[in-house]
Amino acid sequence: GTRGNVQPYIALGKGLQSAGHTIRLVSHSNFESLVASYGLEFWSFGNDVKDAVENSDMQALTEKGNFLLLLAKMAKEAQREALRFAEGGLLAAQGMEIVLSGLGGLFIGIAIAEKLDIPLVQAYVVPFSPTREMSSVLTPKLPPVLNRVSHQLTRQLMWQGFRSADTIARKKVLNIPAAPLLGPYDSKSIHNMPILYGFSPSVIPAPSDWNDQTHITGFWFVDEADDWQPPAALLDFLQAGPAPIYIGFGSMSSRAPEQTADLIIQ
C-alpha cells in the first residue's frame, strides 16, 4: 500500500527485532529506502506501488469513496501481479518460522504460510474480526443485530474480489490447492494464532465477544530521531500566533465530507 499502510509494520518489525527476532519486511520496491533506514531487512515484490496508486482511475475512485469500484480495480491489479507477489513472498519467507500479515497481504500470506507449513499472525490497523458491538469500517452505523453480518459481508467482498488472483498464485507458483469458496479464513495456518490490532483501546475499545487470542496493542509508531530540527519557516509560523490544530487523514477520502468537517469543528 501507501506509506501509511507500511510504516506501522516498520514499527512492529522494529519492536520484534528489539525482542530478538529476525525480521524480513516484504513490500513494494519504492519502500526499500524507508524500510532500510530503520535497520530492517527488506525484500521486494519487484514493482512500484506508485504505478497503481497514482493511476488517474484509481485516484478518482478513491476521491469518490466508492469502495466496490475501488475493490474491483484493486482486484484486477492483484490478478495481474499475482505471480510476482507469490514468487516474491515465497522467496522472502524461506527459512522464516512465522508469517505476519496485514490486511492487504492477508490472502497471499495465508497461501505462503500453507505452502511452507508455518503459522501466520494477523496484524491489522483497522477492526476486521466480526463482532456484534460495532459495524464494519466499510458500512455506516447499523443496529447491533446487523453488526456481525456487516463484518462477514466485508470479509466476503474482499475475498471474492481477490479469489481469482489467489487461485492463480496457488496453482502456478505455490502448487497448493485452491482456497475454499468462502475464503481461507479457517486455514490451519491461522488456527489458534494471535490477532494483533495496532490502535489504542481508548480509541476503539475491545469488543467483549472477541476471543482471548485477539489483542489491541496500542498504536505502532516508529521512534523518530530526536535531533530533528523544524525548518525556520515552520518555526516562524508556529510562533506567530496561537498554537494551531492540525487534523489530517492522509490519502483517505470521506463519504460524508461535510459531516466529517462538522465533527472536527465540534
Q: Which residue stretches match the model-derived regions?
A:
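N-terminal subdomain of nucleotide-sugar transferases
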Residues: 1-43, 94
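Nucleotide-sugar-dependent glycosyltransferase catalytic domains
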Residues: 28-244, 251, 256-262
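Short glycine-centered, acidic/aromatic-flanked micro-motifs in structured strand/loop junctions
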Residues: 1, 248-251
